[in-house]
Amino acid sequence: MDARISPEIPGIIQPGNVTQDLKMLVCKLLNSPKPSKTFPGSQPVSFQHSDIRDKLVAQDYYVCEKTDGLRVLMLVVVNPITGEQGCFMIDRENNYYLVNGFHFPRLPQKKKEELLETSQNGTLIDGELVIQKNPMTKLQELRYLMFDCLAINGRSLVQSPTSSRLAHLGKEFYKPYYDLRSIYPDKCATFPFKLSMKHMDFSYSLVKVANSLDKLPHLSDGLIFTPVRTPYAVGGKDSLLLKWKPEQENSVDFKLILEIPMTEDNSVAKKDPRRWYYNYDAKPTFALYVWQGGSDVNTKLQNFEQPFDKREMQVLEKTYKRFAELSISDEQWQELKNLEEPLNGRIVECTKDPETGSWTMLRFRDDKLNGNHTSVVQKVLESISDSVTIDDLAESVPEIKSAWDERKNGAYQHHSSSFSESRQQPKAEPVAEKKQTEPKYVDDDDWSD
């Protein structure tokens, strides 16, 4: 087990009637036919060797670090009755949390005072809550790293390409927020946490991004590759959105079931039901169950010392199947007992040792109701066996860059030819590619308060 800590949403979970109204609003912002019962955010797929040529070489991609935090959408909306702005966080279980204390302004049109007078309304952002270490105070701080924008002030962006969505996020949301904090710091002193845009590099800069992972103020466990020109995939797996992890970081979320051994007491009569009893002094078997789909209900116990009874196991096995056993040392078992927390039925994130094949626990995932679906587990196992290394990715960089340049030059030649033939305006000069700089994942001067 490692020391990873999942951040908690600093908000109040909303009741059903409020949540339903908010889901209807999100449905409208996403241009969806009906409100989603599940998390509306897109989900990446595990990276495989074939993705290098079939995807990274075939089309333009952004690359960024894969933050090891809590994935949440952020909805900013103005109450039509009270006129007050509300900020809501949507977690992976599609729960809505009201986070008080923020003010998110619109981009000023004439004067800076508009930062205090205007409010974002109908803005939906995708990002990750993360715990960062402040280099000045050495204290842990909560921050929201934004990496996509699904709607801005009531205008849906899900059909726009990623490049356009990021431009809207930067100009229409992040800039006025950052200007507000810069010009009126006293007005922002009680904000629950800070926000930053996650830096996006071009895919051929993947080595530079990978080399920066251990220098970040938060935990990062890999890379995310996002296609530049595709729309946002609402509420499900996006086969073009790729997550790469080093072999040792590829993990699976299982449901943990403790199988407490039973011991026979020969001093008790054979027909006495007390002859066999659960031996709580012995270390149990730590069974890992994989989710088959469907609702998981009534299977979490309140006391880690109590095993599942027959009825609870029958309920569990309608949606879960025993998959493997977790390797826990005696020392680790003592650590778990010392927590004095319920263990049965919790979701645990585990990694597989490539040499021994045993599963080891990274941490509890209490932000998840269910473990990974069996199809996801299979993909992760394929990714582990396929084992794309950073060296494999590095070797592909020249081919990725060459293909990128060919597409850029081809687009320019087509663009230039079209204008030349129409004679509507003089021949355009090629747009210089932005010089790549060192990744700036958070604002360098944004640690002071």
Swiss-Prot record:
Which GO terms label this protein's molecular function in UniProt?
A: ATP binding; GTP binding; mRNA guanylyltransferase activity; RNA polymerase II C-terminal domain binding
Give compartment(s).
Nucleus
Instruction: List all Polar residues biased stretches.
Output: 414-423
Query: What's its EC?
Result: 2.7.7.50
InterPro entries attached to this UniProt entry = mRNA_cap_enzyme_adenylation (IPR001339), mRNA_cap_enzyme_alpha (IPR017075), mRNA_cap_enzyme_C (IPR013846), mRNA_Capping_Enz/RNA_Phosphat (IPR051029), NA-bd_OB-fold (IPR012340)
Q: Which GO terms describe its biological process?
A: 7-methylguanosine mRNA capping; positive regulation of transcription by RNA polymerase II; tRNA processing
Keywords, A to Z, come to: GTP-binding, mRNA capping, mRNA processing, Nucleotide-binding, Nucleotidyltransferase, Nucleus, Transferase
The protein depicted here goes by the name mRNA-capping enzyme subunit alpha
This chain's source organism reads Candida glabrata (strain ATCC 2001 / BCRC 20586 / JCM 3761 / NBRC 0622 / NRRL Y-65 / CBS 138)
**GN (gene name):** CEG1
